[in-house]
């Protein structure tokens, strides 16, 4: 029985020693199979999604620089040569200049609106407590009897 147990332990040890399984534990856990790629993003975001007046003004400046560009204006062969290591993202929501102007006007309106402007509060009240006090009327009368008025 002991020799059988020794043989089994010896076989398991030999299999573990000479197995060709991968034993590299220092491997980078963020490999390609994790879905995370380190690369710069290519393309520009939609300026019509500006959420403040400053972003709206920047979008207007960019509109003057880029103008109304369409997909036909770009030569794909040039981009494939220059950006071989870059991953291209679609330009989501690329609207025309009119939509960017509407976004700018909406940002102006929000600045002028008291509820959403720069002085808008969070709606929380930090003043004194209003409403029913924790002191009832009887104990309040007892406390006021002991006080003396100063003239």
From Swiss-Prot:
Functional description taken from the UniProt entry: CAP-1 and CAP-2, but not CAP-3 are ligands for the Capa receptor. CAP-1 and CAP-2 are probably components of the signal transduction pathway that leads to Malpighian tubule fluid secretion via the second messenger nitric oxide. CAP-3 is a ligand for the PK1-R G-protein coupled receptor.
Keyword tags: Amidation, Cleavage on pair of basic residues, Neuropeptide, Secreted, Signal
UniProt main location, coarse: secreted
Localization (cell): Secreted
Annotated positions of the Valine amide modification: 42, 92
Family: Belongs to the pyrokinin family.
Protein name: Cardio acceleratory peptide 2b
Lineage: Eukaryota, Metazoa, Ecdysozoa, Arthropoda, Hexapoda
Residue numbers covered by the propeptide annotation in the UniProt entry: 22-28, 45-80, 95-113, 134-151
């Amino acid at each position: 029985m002991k020799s059988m147990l020794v043989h089994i332990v010896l076989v398991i040890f030999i299999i573990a020693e000479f197995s060709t399984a991968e034993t590299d534990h220092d491997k980078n856990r963020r490999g390609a199979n994790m879905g995370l790629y380190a690369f710069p993003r290519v393309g520009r975001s939609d300026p019509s999604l500006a959420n403040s007046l400053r972003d709206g003004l920047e979008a207007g400046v960019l509109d003057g620089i880029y103008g109304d560009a369409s997909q036909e204006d770009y030569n794909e062969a040039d981009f494939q040569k220059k950006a071989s290591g870059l991953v291209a993202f679609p330009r989501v929501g690329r609207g025309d200049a009119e939509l960017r102007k509407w976004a700018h006007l909406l940002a102006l309106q929000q600045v002028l609106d008291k509820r959403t402007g720069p002085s808008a509060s969070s709606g929380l009240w930090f003043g004194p407590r209003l409403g029913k006090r924790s002191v009832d009327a009887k104990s309040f009368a007892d406390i006021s009897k002991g006080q003396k008025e100063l003239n």
